[in-house]
Structure formats: C-alpha cells, structure tokens
Amino acid sequence: MPKQMAAPGKRRVRGSSTGRPIMALLDLLGRRWTLRILWELRGAPLTSRALRAACDDASPTILQTRLDELREASLVELMPESGYGLTALGLEFAENFMPLVRFAERWSKRAAN
C-alpha cells in the first residue's frame, strides 16, 4: 500500500478526492496503531521498547512506520534522551481528543444497557 498522508496538498489522501485537512487527518488516524501510539504518548515520552510494550507488542516494523508518519505530520518527535514524545501540535491533538474519550465512556455505558 502506498504511503499517503501528511500535509494537505502535497499528497493524495486515501478515500478523498479533495485532500482537505480533515480528510488527511482522518486518513492518518485511521491507520492501524496510530491512535494507540498517540494515546500512549499522551502522558510522557517513551522509548521505542517501552512504546512497543505499551502497544501490546505491535510489530516493530509497523510501529516504526507509524512513528515516521507521525513525525512527518509534526505530531510526534524523537527526543534524544527520552525517546518519542508528542510535539506541541501532538499535545494540542491529545487535548482536543479528550472530549471524544469522555463521549466514548458515556456511550459505552448507554450501549451496555
């Protein structure tokens, strides 16, 4: 599967003929392990090994591919002494994602009834 994503206007976006920013973001977030990586990095930077363990031993190859994509999208950065962490933009994403997490909790309780 060809690598697609990053900055709108630079590449085609899977599932979109427009390449609008929201479509590019949803394309990136919809890739396997992407949301999990962002979720695990929300608290503190992690080394590759710690991140892999936190991600239920995801394949090192796919984990590295996703980290590269997230770095290209400016959501994650490699910090020399502490491993991978969220950038300022990544932290902004995590902050904006939390209302969806809270909604999912409420939805889960209602769906269980």
Language-model-derived ranges and their functions:
Residues M1-G9, A54-R66:
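Membrane-interacting alpha-helical segments
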Residues P2-G9, S16-P21, W39, E95-N113:
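Amphipathic alpha-helical dimerization/coiled-coil segments
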Residues G15-I62, A73-L75, Y84-L91:
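N-terminal helix-turn-helix DNA-binding core of bacterial DNA-binding proteins
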Residues R49-A50, L63, R102, A112:
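Short linear functional motifs in flexible/disordered or boundary regions
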Residues D68-N113:
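Charged, amphipathic alpha-helical coiled-coil/dimerization segments
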